[in-house]
Amino acid sequence: MPHTAKILLLGSGELGREFVISAKRLGAYVVACDAYAAAPAMQVADASEVLSMLDADALRAVVAKHHPDYVVPEIEAIRTEVLAEIEADGFNVVPSAYATQMTMNRDAIRDLAAQELGITTSRYRYAKNLEEVRAAAEFTGYPCVIKPVMSSSGKGQSTVRSADKLEEAWDYAVANMRGDRKRVIVEQFIDFDYEITLLTVRHKDGITFCPPIGHRQERGDYRESWQPATMSKPAIAAAQEMAEKVVTALQGNGKGFGLFGVEFFVKGEEVIFSELSPRPHDTGMVTSVSQNLSEFDLHARAIMGLHVPSEILARPSASAVILAEQESETVSYSGLAAAMEGGADIRIFGKPNTRPYRRMGVALATGGDTDYARTAAVAAANKLHIHYGD
């Protein structure tokens, strides 16, 4: 099939689905991979492969089979040493094998930011057992946040306000770890005024920043996001300076092109680095309606060496997540018409089954200001009902 580029997508969730749509609009041929069949991105891709991204041999085999122009990781749990191997063989790993290695583990990216780049972060320590957790919490003070160095969507994260809750938090983190590293980060709880995601695009002509995205989390996972977030010019400048430092440092041996989701806490005028994702960010779903080029469009353009504007503008918009409440092998929906009556847009991700707190869709709304858009998005999300079982 004629195409402008061949992309191997490693991970096929809802963010991957939107990326596939953006890439295909630019003429790309996309092979979507995941550990289960009919994952969201597979439903819109040209071809698909089912494999574990933690199976090194399977990962090598799928790259050899398809020989892509770009290898695009969409998840954290990948054998990054294989990505380094294939990058050394001449494959273009997005944004680089080094970036995927560093950001797969919270300890690696935190140490890079705090120790090598001198970027402001919360106080933190690492722990491999409960005894070390107790010592780390004494160092950070209470409350503190405990989370696995490797997990996704906030799984395993908890806020601890007293020493008698440390064992429970450790057990929860261990139960939700990904990969084979039994290690957590214990960090100072920042009593922030708000938190933001700064979408940062590194492309052939330099770096482009999107307007800041505000977001609200529960259980360590995003529930709402809105753009543009109200933020002072000095605070925006500080966030941009830190984001540029980190994404530039992650180039490694690759091109380092793509979109990064850089998270910050903001307290007054102080901006504190939190985390970074070298791919489209879940809070950035709002850009599907807020920006003329969504985060997925920007990621595809940057990867493929296409033009990315130097300035991105956003109209007041918001997103609200639609969550499953229970486990079921079958799922259906009702209330779509009612959810869209107020002008909101609904994106159903097409996941084949449910479990508690699994993201099944998102409501998107625009308005005269972000408060109006947030209210509209939440109202729309509440009108879409998930049905479990036959």
UniProtKB/Swiss-Prot annotation:
A GO cellular component annotation in the UniProt record: cytosol
Highest taxon listed in the record's lineage: Bacteria
ATP-grasp domain spans which residues? 111-304
Q: Which EC number(s) are documented for this chain?
A: 6.3.1.21
Q: Per UniProt, what is one Pfam family of this protein?
A: RS_preATP-grasp-like
Q: Which residues bind Mg(2+)?
A: 263, 275
Annotated GO biological process:
'de novo' IMP biosynthetic process
Q: Does the keyword Ligase apply?
A: yes
* Biochemical pathway: Purine metabolism; IMP biosynthesis via de novo pathway; N(2)-formyl-N(1)-(5-phospho-D-ribosyl)glycinamide from N(1)-(5-phospho-D-ribosyl)glycinamide (formate route): step 1/1
**Could you give a GO molecular-function term held by this entry?**
ATP binding
Q: Does the keyword 4Fe-4S apply?
A: no
> Quaternary state and partners of this protein?
Homodimer.
Q: Which family does it belong to?
A: Belongs to the PurK/PurT family.
> What job does the chain carry out?
Involved in the de novo purine biosynthesis. Catalyzes the transfer of formate to 5-phospho-ribosyl-glycinamide (GAR), producing 5-phospho-ribosyl-N-formylglycinamide (FGAR). Formate is provided by PurU via hydrolysis of 10-formyl-tetrahydrofolate.
What protein does this entry describe? Formate-dependent phosphoribosylglycinamide formyltransferase
